[in-house]
């Protein structure tokens, strides 16, 4: 248990940041699922639009330290590849 006032404050701050980070990751996951759903449906326009919406959010996740840059690079590469594969 935290004894100093600063340690107690850090616990409060960490809990608040955890909520923000969880929301950010959830938003990214939702956007990725939209791309995957559009690809599964074979809708190239919707998939491309969803990918354009997901990419900056994923980059923001890296900038904020929520996701690792290699993870985002891999996900973005795979999504782009799947969107481009639609006939």
Swiss-Prot record:
It comes from the Bacteria. GO terms for cellular component: small ribosomal subunit. One of its GO terms (molecular function) is small ribosomal subunit rRNA binding. GO terms for biological process: translation. PANTHER family: 30S RIBOSOMAL PROTEIN S20 (PTHR33398), SMALL RIBOSOMAL SUBUNIT PROTEIN BS20C (PTHR33398:SF1). Binds directly to 16S ribosomal RNA. Belongs to the bacterial ribosomal protein bS20 family. This is Small ribosomal subunit protein bS20. It comes from Sphingopyxis alaskensis (strain DSM 13593 / LMG 18877 / RB2256).
């Amino acid at each position: 248990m935290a004894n100093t006032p600063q340690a107690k404050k850090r616990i409060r701050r960490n809990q608040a940041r955890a909520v923000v980070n969880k929301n950010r990751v959830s938003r990214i996951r939702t956007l990725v699922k939209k791309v995957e759903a559009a690809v599964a449906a074979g809708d190239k326009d919707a998939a491309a639009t969803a990918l354009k919406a997901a990419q900056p959010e994923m980059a923001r996740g890296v900038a904020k330290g929520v996701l690792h840059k290699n993870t985002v690079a891999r996900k973005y590469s795979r999504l782009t590849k799947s969107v481009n594969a639609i006939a």
